[in-house]
Design a protein with these regions (language model features):
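Short helix-loop capping/hinge motifs at secondary-structure junctions, enriched
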Residues: 141-147, 166, 179-187, 266-273
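Short beta-strand->loop
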Residues: 44-46, 138-140, 158-185, 200-203, ...
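Ligand-binding pocket segment of bilobal, Venus flytrap-like solute-binding proteins
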Residues: 184-251
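A bilobed periplasmic-binding-protein/Venus flytrap-type ligand-binding module shared by bacterial periplasmic
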Residues: 133-142, 257-274, 291-295
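C-terminal motif of bacterial Sec signal peptides marking the signal peptidase cleavage site
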Residues: 17-18
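N-terminal segment of the mature folded domain
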Residues: 31-167, 309-310, 316, 341, ...
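Bacterial N-terminal signal peptides that target proteins for export
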Residues: 1-7
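Extracellular/periplasmic juxtamembrane helices and adjacent flexible linkers that interface
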Residues: 267-349
Length: 349
């Protein structure tokens, strides 16, 4: 980000997040119990989950104190691109829990011996409390007349996305476009690649996180369309748009799961397993599910989702694993060095 934009962009990000400061490796030792009986947890999470956990953590702390005779607990947050966050934990960031936006990030921690292989069985819904989908945020009046994925390949269009090489948000964007291309072209992979390559050639900025992409589009006023998660698009339009932005729902889009897990090795070393498990379990509570819906995340609780149908309209989505294989297969084929994404990305972008 150029220096002349840095101050305003940071102010915007702080305002939109309105959350406790992100904590990096300097706070890695904070996720533990201490001799006074106080418990401290560190939740390492993806970029645009800031708003959820800013409001969820106080709800959980209040409930925890009720259940534990007023016992003290604090929860600290670390946010960034999902895969970067997973790598940080794999390389030593002492997270008690991880709350990511794709299963491969937690599977990485399984391979590192930090999380149990059956982590999806530890919580309901395969450990996915919320889902989202990929939508388009456009400027007032939709001047480029973007109505569906196909329109993103138009000439003279500038797109802003998170970088698919390092972020879950960006990967869902790529897979959403590819899934649309396969459906629109009767599973003709060659035609799909032509479409995706043209769409990627229109990308003006590949940001290093979903929130950074939002800042670039909304605050720096770069681009005609931002491709991002439904919750991020809605919060941006509602909180900072002042009528200047509109959300476009494609007819068919990719479903984003937000899996969670206890980092078993860390929790056991610190004696925080019980608190960490209670913390994640509370994501399925009615108050937490309602909170997620109000923040435009699609809750696992079907009754809560139905009650918010006006804000979270029904739409046709696909699970990327049903089309592209397991996350290991997806990462290897599409996002490894020299993979399909690299093959289709215009050099110099």
């Amino acid at each position: 980000m150029p220096s002349k934009h840095l101050t305003s962009a940071l102010l915007f990000t702080a305002a939109l997040s309105a959350c406790t400061p992100d904590n990096g490796t300097q706070n890695a030792a904070s996720g533990s119990g201490d001799k006074t009986g106080s418990v401290k947890l560190l939740n390492v999470s993806y970029d645009v989950a800031r708003d959820l956990y800013k409001d969820f953590n106080p709800l959980f702390i209040e409930e925890y104190k009720k259940q534990h005779n007023g016992a003290d607990i604090t929860v600290q947050q670390s946010h960034g691109g999902s895969s970067k966050q997973a790598l940080a934990v794999a390389n030593g960031l002492k997270a008690d829990v991880v709350t990511m936006n794709q299963g491969s990030d937690i599977d990485l921690l399984v391979k590192k011996g930090l999380v149990k292989a059956d982590w999806q069985k530890a919580f309901p819904n395969n450990a996915v409390p919320f889902t989202s989908t990929t939508v388009f945020l456009v400027r007032k009046g939709n001047p480029k007349q973007i109505k569906d994925w196909g329109d993103l390949a138009k000439d003279n269009l500038k797109i802003v996305i998170a970088n698919p090489k390092v972020t879950g948000n960006g990967r869902y964007t790529f897979l959403g476009a590819y899934g649309y291309g396969l459906k629109a072209n009767n599973n003709d992979d060659a035609k799909t690649r032509e479409y995706v390559k043209k769409m990627l050639s229109n990308v003006e900025v590949f940001e290093n996180g979903g929130r950074a992409a939002t800042t670039t589009f909304v605050q720096r006023n770069i681009g005609d369309v931002l491709i991002t998660f439904e919750n991020e698009a809605n919060l941006s339009a509602k909180q900072f748009g002042n009528g200047e932005f509109e959300i476009v729902y494609p007819k068919y889009s990719v479903r984003m799961d937000s899996p969670v897990a206890v980092v078993d090795k860390v929790a056991d070393e610190r004696g925080t397993r019980q608190a960490a498990t209670e913390y994640l379990n509370y994501l399925w509570s009615k108050p937490a599910q309602e909170l997620g819906a109000k923040l435009y995340l699609r809750p696992a609780d079907k009754d809560v989702l139905a009650a918010h149908a006006s804000e979270l309209p029904p739409m046709e989505t696909f699970n990327p694993n049903d089309i592209f294989g397991t996350w290991d297969e997806i990462m290897s084929k599409y996002f490894s060095d020299g993979g399909v994404y690299d093959q289709l990305t215009v050099k110099g972008k």
